[in-house]
A protein has these predicted regions:
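Glycine-enriched, solvent-exposed interface loops adjoining structured elements
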Residues: 1-166
Length: 166
């Protein structure tokens, strides 16, 4: 089977739908995007699992999320002896209630999703410990400039079928 690309997928959609019209062609990017989003929600292949390493900023209760993170699995920090300490996930309300004064510091115990770009920890870190975040990454979206991704290389039939369903 030949490798699927953005170009071959858009042509396959036109062929399967027997529609070469401008209106249909203008919507193919939308069909592809919706199909990728659906697949990304419905499956969680190991190939999408990533790990990122960073460090706490002393006296800052916020940590930047990896830019491609969809779901956080684990949040770990390494103490001075390189012992891995897993933080427990909580809600941001819990963290604000547990550690209301952000200027007070300590060894972090909890984390919460704060926004699309940040995580919240408590207690506020008292040192710039190394951190590891395990997560499911977002799928790289297909486009005319990004012509292949995991789906075109590993699940061509699934991607085509999902696009046709849209």
């Amino acid at each position: 089977m030949a490798t699927m690309t953005y170009t071959t997928l858009t042509q396959d959609l036109k062929d399967w739908m027997e529609n070469d019209g401008t209106e249909f062609s203008n919507e193919t990017d939308n069909f592809i995007s919706l199909a990728e989003q659906r697949i990304s929600r419905d499956i969680d292949p190991y190939a999408f699992h990533e790990s990122a390493t960073s460090s706490f900023n002393t006296s800052d209760r916020f940590v930047s999320k990896p830019s491609d993170a969809k779901i956080i699995f684990h949040f770990i920090w390494l103490d001075s002896d390189s012992k891995r300490i897993f933080l427990e996930e909580r809600t941001d309300e819990y963290i604000y209630d547990y550690w209301p004064t952000s200027s007070s510091t300590g060894n972090p115990k909890y984390w919460a999703n704060y926004s699309d770009t940040a995580l919240l920890v408590a207690p506020t870190p008292n040192s710039s410990y190394t951190i590891e975040i395990s997560y499911a990454r977002r799928l790289a979206e297909l486009s005319s400039s990004n012509t292949t991704n995991w789906l075109t290389q590993n699940a061509q039939d699934l991607l085509l079928y999902a696009c046709l369903m849209e």
